[in-house]
Amino acid sequence: MIRIAMVEDEAAVREQLMGYVQRYTRQYGTEFSVTEFADGMDILENYRPVYDIVFLDVEMKHLDGMETARRVRELDKDVIIVFITNMAQYAIG
């Protein structure tokens, strides 16, 4: 089972991402355990290195994704961090 932390401040986007994960599960049979966080502070509050992947929004109200990633990396050198954003300047073309 792959353990995912999903850090996204917009509930509609979290729901959309969950849909992608569920569709992947249906297509490929891979099982996921997803824990949702609405803010960078939420995941950092009691962070333990139990996740395989962290999906992390770049722009959030209380603590942005870049700073959250820096702090997560201090606590967990092995977790895969995937940034998610709708901001064109951060997109890879």
PLM features per residue range, with description:
Residues 1-3:
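Non-catalytic signal-transmission and effector/linker regions of two-component phosphorelay proteins
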Residues 6, 36, 83-84:
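Conserved SAM-binding loop
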Residues 10-35:
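Two-component/phosphorelay signaling modules centered on CheY-like receiver
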Residues 18-19, 48, 67-68:
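Short amphipathic alpha-helical segments
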Residues 51-93:
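CheY-like receiver
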